[in-house]
């Protein structure tokens, strides 16, 4: 193994940049959304082409260097690695093209959600993304992809038509292959839902959708004492089509409040009537964060998340799926959150997000699990995605913040009779105690994934977010 990989890598790359410790660009090259679980690699390879991805992967494998892939750099610990490992950084491969006639979007591996929205909206189209502009579009899709169009078209992975992925064979040689329903269909199944396990995706083709609507958006503010009332109301609504929302525990000025955010991706005339039971709740109408009926142009749909999605500080984000939301569980989780803020006021930027979407379309898609490797529980058993986000600066709080996330999960899952409801793991945002089976399930699906791993990554060089 070479002591410094820079010269060796530059010799085998065509137009890519290699950055190592001591270079002026080094601090920016290893910067991520969160400093939590950050590691120091031997080098960061900022690739610019499929050929250079192949060369970088081949170099890493042949020199016994672990490697990880960085798209948007928003995972807790996936896109970072210690020396002698290297980071293959796709951030200079962000081209997005739209074919209006074919209604498709083609995105390079480093394209962000914001890149996808910008390109699609420029020609009157939309593409399935999450809620953060700077998160990697393809990286999020590989794990299923919760997001804005879920109620209309299903998970982001449901909208993928094909992918190009760099894989490594038994001899350690890297190559790019196509994956689609017609070519390497087994790999295509695995990529759509468990795609971090198999290779480096350098390009994906998504369905695009004609889109002319602004999005209706409202935010109601409540005191903590009303959390149970709000949870009961949220649980009673059947979300359809473009309806989506988010229940938020947050503490602006270190004073905890509950937010109920609502979006409707569709006709504004329909929005208020569909959300009427929630709009009738007694919110704090004089609060500066309380408003009803704003319109957001599609290109700006995710702009309100820019602060929470921006780089800097230490953030520990995890997620799990939940079937039902009870008033008691919501109040218990809020109490855990408020106790934490009292004990650690320096971490008052911490949020707890509970997102909900219309699931009617997602439940109708891929009912037998033969088209995607998205867990069937995502479609049948999840109505809510709970996402505790511990946000702080002091590394001394790492353990306390990791503990908070787990305590929030347990509060939501503990039922009134003391039994524990089943939570559904999310591979894109795992808890630190998540396991192979809590994320990928058991039985036939897990066995199929393991067989695919042996076929497409026989040397086990692609680390994945959660190990098989």
Swiss-Prot record:
<comment type="similarity">
    <text>Belongs to the oxygen-dependent FAD-linked oxidoreductase family.</text>
</comment>
<feature type="domain" description="FAD-binding PCMH-type">
    <location>
        <begin position="37"/>
        <end position="211"/>
    </location>
</feature>
<comment type="function">
    <text>FAD-linked oxidoreductase; part of the gene cluster that mediates the biosynthesis of hexadehydro-astechrome (HAS), a tryptophan-derived iron(III)-complex that acts as a virulence factor in infected mice. Within the pathway, hasG converts the prenyl to a methylbutadienyl side chain. The HAS biosynthesis begins with the synthesis of a tethered Trp-Ala dipeptide by the NRPS hasD.</text>
</comment>
<keyword id="KW-0560">Oxidoreductase</keyword>
<keyword id="KW-0843">Virulence</keyword>
<protein>
    <recommendedName>
        <fullName>FAD-linked oxidoreductase hasG</fullName>
        <ecNumber>1.1.1.-</ecNumber>
    </recommendedName>
</protein>
<keyword id="KW-0285">Flavoprotein</keyword>
<dbReference type="InterPro" id="IPR016167">
    <property type="entry name" value="FAD-bd_PCMH_sub1"/>
</dbReference>
<dbReference type="Pfam" id="PF01565">
    <property type="entry name" value="FAD_binding_4"/>
</dbReference>
<dbReference type="GO" id="GO:0071949">
    <property type="term" value="F:FAD binding"/>
</dbReference>
<dbReference type="InterPro" id="IPR050416">
    <property type="entry name" value="FAD-linked_Oxidoreductase"/>
</dbReference>
<keyword id="KW-0274">FAD</keyword>
<dbReference type="InterPro" id="IPR036318">
    <property type="entry name" value="FAD-bd_PCMH-like_sf"/>
</dbReference>
<dbReference type="InterPro" id="IPR016169">
    <property type="entry name" value="FAD-bd_PCMH_sub2"/>
</dbReference>
<dbReference type="GO" id="GO:0016491">
    <property type="term" value="F:oxidoreductase activity"/>
</dbReference>
<dbReference type="InterPro" id="IPR006094">
    <property type="entry name" value="Oxid_FAD_bind_N"/>
</dbReference>
<dbReference type="InterPro" id="IPR016166">
    <property type="entry name" value="FAD-bd_PCMH"/>
</dbReference>
<comment type="pathway">
    <text>Secondary metabolite biosynthesis.</text>
</comment>
């Amino acid at each position: 193994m070479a002591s410094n990989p820079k010269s060796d890598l530059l010799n085998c790359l065509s137009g890519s940049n290699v950055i190592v410790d001591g270079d002026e660009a080094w601090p920016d090259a290893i910067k991520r959304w969160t400093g939590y679980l950050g590691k120091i690699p031997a080098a960061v390879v900022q690739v610019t082409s499929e050929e250079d991805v192949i060369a970088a992967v081949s170099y890493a494998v042949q020199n016994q260097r672990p490697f990880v892939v960085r798209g948007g750099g928003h995972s807790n610990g996936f896109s970072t690695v210690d020396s002698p490992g290297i980071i293959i950084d796709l951030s200079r491969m962000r081209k997005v093209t739209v074919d209006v006639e074919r209604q498709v979007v083609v995105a390079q591996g480093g394209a962000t959600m914001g890149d996808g929205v910008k390109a699609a909206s420029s020609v009157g189209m939309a593409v399935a993304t999450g809620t953060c502009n700077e998160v990697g579009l393809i990286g999020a899709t590989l794990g299923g992809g919760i997001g804005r169009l879920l109620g209309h078209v299903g998970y982001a992975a449901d909208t993928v038509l094909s992918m190009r992925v760099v894989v490594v064979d038994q001899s350690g040689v890297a190559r790019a292959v196509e994956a689609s329903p017609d070519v390497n269909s087994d790999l295509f199944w695995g990529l759509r839902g468990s795609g971090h396990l198999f290779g480096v995706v350098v390009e994906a083709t998504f369905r695009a959708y004609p889109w002319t609507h602004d999005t209706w958006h409202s935010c109601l503010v409540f005191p903590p004492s009303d959390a149970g009332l709000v949870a009961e109301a949220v649980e009673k609504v059947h979300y359809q089509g473009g309806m989506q929302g988010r229940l938020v525990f947050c503490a602006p000025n270190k004073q905890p409040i509950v937010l109920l955010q609502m979006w409707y991706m569709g006709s504004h005339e329909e929005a208020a009537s569909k959300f009427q039971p929630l709009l009738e709740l007694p919110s704090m109408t004089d609060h500066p964060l309380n408003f009803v009926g704003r319109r957001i142009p599609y290109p700006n749909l995710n702009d309100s998340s820019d602060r929470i999605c921006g780089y800097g500080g230490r953030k520990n984000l995890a997620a799990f799926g939940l079937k039902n939301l009870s008033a008691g569980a919501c109040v218990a989780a809020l109490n855990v959150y408020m106790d934490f803020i009292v004990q650690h006021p320096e971490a008052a930027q911490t949020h707890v997000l509970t997102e909900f979407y219309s699931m009617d379309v997602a439940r109708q898609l891929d009912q037998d699990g033969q088209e995607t490797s998205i867990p069937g529980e995502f479609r049948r058993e999840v109505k809510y995605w709970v996402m505790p986000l511990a946000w702080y600066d002091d590394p001394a709080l790492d353990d306390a913040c990791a503990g908070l996330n787990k305590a929030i999960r347990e509060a939501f899952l503990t039922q009134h009779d003391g039994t524990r409801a089943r939570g559904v793991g999310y591979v894109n945002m795992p808890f630190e105690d998540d396991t192979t089976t809590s994320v990928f399930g058991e039985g036939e699906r897990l066995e199929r994934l393991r067989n695919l791993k042996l076929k497409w990554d026989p040397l086990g060089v692609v680390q994945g977010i959660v190990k098989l």
